[in-house]
C-alpha cells in the first residue's frame, strides 16, 4: 500500500526520507524533522520508532541508524516510520528540553497552533502515530544517571506483553503512563507501544545499542513484519518488575 507523510506519497517497496517542517530559527534557517520511511513490498502493519524526544538522549539515534541498515523493503511486510531525532532543537543544543524549557515528552498530543513543544507533538501525533498500528519510543537516563536496558510498558495488555517478551530486554517493567507522554497518547489511541530505556544522556553505550537493535528486530518478527529467524538455542525471559529505584 501507499503511505503519505508530509504530503509525500511513498509506494510499496520504496525507501524515502521526508523532512517534516518544524520551525524557523531566528536566523531564518529552516529546521526540519527527518522521517525515514521503509515501505515494504508486502502488506502488513505500520510500526513507528521515535528517539531523542529529549535532545540529549543519543543511544536511540544510533539504534535507528543501525536498524535501517538491516531492514529492506524487499523483505518487510508493512511499513516502518522512524524518527531518529524528534527534539531537533534540544539535539542541536545538547539539551534535554526545548528552548523554552518545556519537556516535549509531556506535551502530547499537542496542537497545531500552540508552543513549539505542542506543535512538534502535534506533528508526530498526526503524521506518524495516527498512521501506525504499533510502536516503540527510545530513551536513555538523564545526565550522570545510567539506566539498565529495560522495557517500560503496560504489561496487562496482551499485545504489549507479547511485544515486551519478544524484545528480550533484561528487565520489563509494568509501568503506568505519565500524562502528556508519547506512550500515553499512542496507547490511548489504541496503538500498542513499548518504551525502551538504556544508558545515560550524551553518551553512546554499545551494549545498550546492540540490545536495542536486536530487540526491535525481534518485535518486528513476532508481529510478522520480518521473516522469522531460526529458533534460538537459549531463550532468556526478561525479569518482570512493578517498580524501580535509583542506586546512588
PLM regions with names:
Residues 1-248:
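Structured catalytic-domain cores with a bias toward divalent-metal coordination
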